[in-house]
């Protein structure tokens, strides 16, 4: 199944940050309650890697208020031969 990296940024002020984290945790969603956070290092964002059929399906994991601002990237892997041979890179 395809894997997707999801990044959702939020405002850095204390109230906005706290509210954002509370909304994620209150959903009870396994994905959201296990998100990685950068807030304590000054990077106000949540990161999640999930399996989904499409970017659109991955976006639905997020609370509705944050879906439109999320960055979603399809993940892939490469074989060494693909990179060493400078051939057309195709994910496997």
Region annotations inferred by a language model:
Residues 1-92:
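Conserved, structured core segments of small domains
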């Amino acid at each position: 199944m395809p894997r997707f990296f999801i990044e959702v940024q939020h405002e850095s002020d204390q109230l906005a940050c706290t509210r954002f984290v509370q909304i994620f945790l209150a959903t009870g969603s396994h994905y959201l309650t296990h998100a990685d956070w950068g807030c304590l290092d000054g990077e106000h964002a949540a990161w999640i890697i999930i399996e989904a059929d499409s970017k659109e399906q991955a976006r639905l994991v997020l609370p509705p208020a944050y879906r439109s601002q999320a960055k979603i990237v399809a993940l892939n892997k490469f074989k060494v031969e693909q990179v060493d041979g400078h051939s057309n890179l195709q994910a496997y």
